[in-house]
Amino acid sequence: FCNAIHLVEDKSQVMREVSDTLRSGGIFAFNSSFFKGDLTEETSQFYRRWMMRSLRILKNDFGLKPSKEKVMARQALSIAEYTEILEDNDFRVSMTEIEPVEVPLEGWQDISYFEDFIAGALPGVPLKEASRSLVEAAAQIFNEFDLSSVRRDWLSIVAVRQ
């Protein structure tokens, strides 16, 4: 699961199915940039400003606002919660790692075109308008605060089937 496990609604079921498929000693690995603990204080500040600016652009330019629904990508799990689900499904965690990555403006703008990200960040907003507001807001925030990049932490977990 390359940066997708957070999109799965029933993580326990998926891990159970993977466990049923693997033999003892088999490896299940995944990563995610959306987990409890993924945002540093700097990243949180950027993200709040980015989302608030996006909302303002959506309202002012398109007369739109997102729905209040909470989608799967916004229901983040902690390392401990992932570990518990894995252990409940006959896995032993052999490695967890958090890797800090400096993401330039282009990276934030690129993700602004990704449908699953938009559904999490601005649920219910049409893709075209959501993308335009996210891209423009990111550029404005980077410019305003003279940013060259913003850190994002990536979680990687490797587990062994018992």
Regions flagged by a language model, labelled:
Residues F1-S12, F34:
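A short SAM/SAH-binding and catalytic strip from SAM-dependent methyltransferases
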Residues S12-I27:
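A short glycine-rich, Lys/Arg-flanked "PGG" loop and its adjoining helix->strand segment in the class I
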Residues I27-K59:
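Conserved class I S-adenosyl-L-methionine
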Residues G63-E69:
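Short glycine/proline- and acidic residue-enriched helix-loop micro-motifs
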Residues A73-D90:
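Short alpha-helix
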Residues D90-F91, S112-F114, R151-Q162:
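Core SAM-dependent methyltransferase catalytic element
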Residues V93-S148:
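C-terminal helical/coil "lid" or tail adjacent to the Rossmann-like core of SAM-dependent
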